From Swiss-Prot:
It comes from the Bacteria. The keyword Signal does not apply. GO terms for molecular function: magnesium ion binding; monooxygenase activity; ribulose-bisphosphate carboxylase activity. The modification N6-carboxylysine is found at K202. The gene is cbbL. One of its GO terms (biological process) is photorespiration. Mg(2+) binds at K202, D204, E205. The record marks K335 as: Transition state stabilizer. This is Ribulose bisphosphate carboxylase large chain.
């Protein structure tokens, strides 16, 4: 980079002026420590900016550096606290695009704070003029730092015990239309879906407390629906009551009321609500024995562009640290963005104890979760009964499959729509347990089940031509 090299020597040895970032922050001989937090950035420097200088600038501007030397550097140990760009590699097939690896000392981050961690790593550097684009692809969170976080309130194993549901994915449905229903009609829709065979129903992400349906009324009618459906079916049911609110105080007031009326699970929009609010709510949920469903509303604004932003695998890791028992993760086969290998990479990062580096799935670092509970992935968005075999094969048992339009769009109503999905799921689980390959034989499995389930047969006929086949934006 071209700078005006104006420097002034003081008696103390301090040199004022501007110097290249790479002189301080590019350290290719550095060997990362087990306690370092590691980051992989996809970067495109401006013309004329060497990749070493750009990588060093990323390390500097996301840790201790600024655009000029400052005399207060002499008051601290810069080598102890600075971020270090320790490796840079070209991205195959891309012109002027590089993966830049940065190691951050653990002391740079407040314990147990995703908010502080992200403020440091991505808070300022993404607007740096020397970079045309920058994307945070992955983080390696050291075990020493993970141990300062509570993580999910309960996790997958505890949730299954609470619900007494084993050996299959959970089934859910988002109530539609997402806006405009009265609280009583909303509760009616919840009841019909749950009695039809679903485990959960869900508030949509933008249902909070609007004039047409205030939160307290919705909570009461939804809980009445849960209790009636449980009494009829003998199964434990739930509805994700969205407690996202304008302030943390109001959020906790809604959570307290949900617990008081007996709901087993509540919901939060973690990106629009913020990580501070989410961590607060996750800790409340563990103290109070309530499950926490997390919606990722706004994620595509941050993660969909390949060259700039933050990859969802990072947002998923941050959620596991901040706390949540469920997290929406795409479907691979539905209407929302999601290439299979990349999607399953971050799904494993959500629910497994240890995940090895696997660049083919976009996993840049080996991640040990140090016994932190896992997060159940939620597949939701444009799925219907014909997708069931693929969803069971792709996501396995430890997942929640949510059919919104694929339940409520059934010609005979909500309860038959729920029954169609439950029959399709049970048929796929039985076929899988018998050793059948659902990728090859899934269509036959659904057709066989439809012969003795009129509800499923009608759903199969309605959605037999519906596909969402578009090229994925998120590729390696």
């Amino acid at each position: 980079m071209s700078y005006a090299k104006t420097q002034t020597q003081s008696k103390s040895g301090y040199q004022a002026g501007v110097k290249d970032y790479k002189l301080t922050y590019y350290t290719p001989d550095y060997i990362p420590k087990d306690t370092d937090l590691l980051a992989a950035f996809r970067m495109s420097p401006q013309p004329g900016v060497p990749p070493e200088e750009a990588g060093a600038a990323v390390a500097a501007e996301s840790s201790t550096g600024t655009w000029t030397t400052v005399w207060t550097d002499l008051l601290t140990d810069l080598d102890r606290y600075k971020g270090r760009c320790y490796d840079i590699e070209s991205v195959p097939g891309e012109d002027n695009q590089y993966i830049c690896y940065v190691a951050y000392p653990l002391d740079l981050f407040e314990e147990g704070s995703v908010t502080n961690m992200l403020t440091s790593i991505v808070g300022n550097v993404f607007g740096f003029k020397a970079l045309r684009s920058l994307r945070l692809e992955d983080l390696r969170i050291p075990v020493a730092y993970l141990k300062t976080f509570q993580g999910p309130p309960h996790g997958i194993t505890v949730e299954r015990d609470k619900l007494n549901k084993y050996g299959r994915p959970l089934l859910g449905c988002t109530i539609k239309p997402k806006l405009g229903l009265s609280a009583k009609n909303y509760g009616r829709a919840v009841y019909e879906c749950l009695r039809g065979g679903l485990d959960f129903t869900k508030d949509d992400e933008n249902i909070n407390s609007q004039p047409f349906m205030r939160w307290r009324d919705r909570f009461l009618f939804a809980q009445e629906a849960i209790e009636k459906a449980q009494a009829e079916t003998g199964e434990i049911k739930g509805h994700y009551l969205n407690v996202t609110a304008p302030t943390c105080e109001e959020m906790l007031e809604r959570a307290d009321f949900a617990k008081e009326i007996g709901t087993p699970i509540i919901m939060h929009d973690y990106l629009t609500g913020g990580f501070t609010a989410n961590t607060t709510l996750a800790k409340w949920c563990r103290r109070n024995g309530v499950l926490l469903h997390i919606h990722r509303a706004m994620h595509a604004v941050i993660d969909r562009q390949k060259a700039h932003g933050i990859h969802f695998r990072v947002l998923a890791k941050c959620l596991r640290m901040s706390g949540g028992d469920h997290l929406h993760s795409g479907t691979v086969v539905g209407k929302l963005e999601g290439e299979k290998g990349i999607t399953m990479g971050f799904v494993d990062l959500m629910r497994e104890d240890h995940v090895e580096q696997d660049r083919e799935r976009g996993i840049y670092f080996t991640q040990d979760w140090a016994s932190m509970p896992g997060v159940m992935p939620v597949a939701s968005g444009g799925i219907h009964v014909w997708h069931m075999p693929a969803l069971v094969e792709i996501f396995g048992d430890d997942s929640c499959l949510q059919f919104g339009g694929g339940t409520l769009g059934h010609p005979w109503g909500n309860a038959p729509g729920a029954t169609a999905n439950r029959v399709a799921l049970e048929a796929c689980i039985q076929a899988r347990n018998e050793g059948r390959n659902l990728f090859r034989e899934g269509g036959d499995v659904i057709r066989e089940a439809a012969k003795w389930s009129p509800d499923l047969a009608v759903a199969c006929e309605l959605w037999k031509e519906i596909k969402f086949e578009f090229e994925a934006m998120d590729t390696l």
